Every structure is written in structure tokens, then in C-alpha cells.
Amino acid sequence: CVIFGGEPTVHVKGNGKGGRNQELVLQILKLINHSNNILISSIATDGIDGNTKYSGALIENNLIKPKIISHFLKTNNSNSFFKKYGGLIKTGHTHFNLMDIGLILKY
């Protein structure tokens, strides 16, 4: 298990919907796509991730083709990916901004 904190940066290349936490989870998913039994999550402690009403995402590694993941990453449209495949986390505004927190768990 890896637990991490901080605020990742995203180089915006498209005009999609998403935030740095959703994008980070999608980037990690692309990297570990061929591994088994891994859970990835990253959330904004203030409850707002980028230009969405979600705080982040949670997903298990799966069989989604890297080409599909790359399409959503190229347009910075991670929110649409998670709406389609599941995994969005919605906490609402927490009025508390410590930092982003994440988890990568091998089970």
C-alpha cells in the first residue's frame, strides 16, 4: 500500500472536464493496466477537483485498453472517462483544504 499527499499538476492540452486527482488516477491506471489486483484513488480534501463537482476518483485496474485511456488523457477529459466507466467520488464542498490525498493498494 502506498499513501501519498500533495497537489499534482496537470498540463492542460484539451478543454475536457476533470481535475488533477481524476487525471492522476487515470495516468496511474494507464501505467499499471497490465497489473492485477490494484486499487487507485486520489481526492481533493476540499471536495472540489478541477472544473467538476467531484472530489476525485477511485478505480481498480481493469481491462480498458490503454488506447482508450490515452484518448481521454489527450483531451484532459478524465471526468468523462470516470462517468463512463465508474469511479467518481463526490463529497461536496468540505470547507477544509489540507491537500490532495491518494492511495495505491495491491491486494
Predicted ranges, named:
Residues 1-21, 30, 34:
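A glycine- and small/hydrophobic-rich beta-loop-beta segment
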Residues 26-107:
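Internal helix-turn-beta structural module
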